[in-house]
Amino acid sequence: MKNSLLLTMMTVGVCLASCTPANRVVENPLIGAANTMTLDFPKIELSDTATVLHVDAYFRPHNWIRIDAGTYLLADGQKYMLQGSEGILPDSLFWMPDSGEASFVLKFGPLPRGTKSFDFIESDCDDCFKLYGVDLTGKKEYPRYPEGLPRALRKAPEDGPVPEPILAVGTTTVNVRLLGYRRGMVKEVAMYVNSLLNGQEEHTAAIDPESGTATLRFEQYGTAMAYVSCGPVFGMCWIAPGETLDMYIAMEAGGRAIVQRRDKECEPAPGRRLYTTGAYADLNALVDASGGSTIRMNLYSGDFADYRMSADEYTQMVVSKYESLADSIARSPVFGMMKELSLLLS
């Protein structure tokens, strides 16, 4: 009798344990890619009854954002619709406070146990918030190189003198491939080329939704510095006139920037965004690894000079600033090519 009672109690205990919702919390998940910097999910609660996203929002103070009632999570091909919220009303304008930061909660249907990641899709409109590959496995670091990057572009760049400018005219072709692309992520890529003759020229190309590729083609006059914009991913590179080069854009840079923003005490470390072939491949790799920053004079700070200076005083001030800047460049722990580039741009 005692054995039967004990067996019954054990059976009931196992049943209760199996019927209890398995709650799990994922803190600070990695985000694979995003089309926006407005939203972040620093905490996710998973159970057998719901998936709860704790959302941090960042936007201009006194401007509004909106969460569509048709928002859903996409995991392994299945949609899990928005079922509730706290702190925000779907389909209504949410006005940002003075700080430009706010928090709220979004509740969705439960994800199956073992789900490794999901996409957050705020409806299917072109400009709706989309965050891709939100990790649920506890990963702490991004891979060293984005998936799909050719092996030839994974080698360390060679240091040396800054390549000579090419004074020629030609048709330049830039073949763009988005690494980590998902359909609907972005519609086009834009390149702003600083031309010797025409100032800054804008060139855009539609992204093929099937392959995540685009081609930019334009007339170019001399070596040019260009800025590249693709959704939230922004970078710069140097291009030679008349060349055909391949450009790989790491779309994970958008997700990485969101994750790095969580540590408000630490300056985000620049991560690679652009990988290029071509005449300036090594220079572009060093520039991109530095976040596109160089040591140079800031002529637009508002306190560069005093308008009451005489010509001689102004000249001496500029010379002193340049000498101080050159000394800072010489002592900086960067590659020689980057030091030379900083001097050339100063």
Which role fits each region the language model picked out?
Residues 1-25:
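Bacterial Sec-dependent N-terminal signal peptides
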Residues 23-48, 80, 84-88:
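Low-complexity, acidic Ser/Thr/Pro/Gly-rich terminal tails and inter-domain linkers that flank the onset
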Residues 41-43, 91-97, 107-108, 163, ...:
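Beta-strand-rich interaction surfaces with strong enrichment in secreted/lumenal proteins
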Residues 50-60:
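Short, well-ordered beta-strand segments enriched in hydrophobic/aromatic residues
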Residues 58-97:
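The feature marks short-to-medium sequence segments in extracytoplasmic or secretory-pathway proteins
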Residues 83-125:
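Short, solvent-exposed, Trp/other aromatic-anchored flexible loops in extracytoplasmic proteins
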Residues 135-334:
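A non-transmembrane, solvent-exposed segment enriched in polar/low-complexity residues
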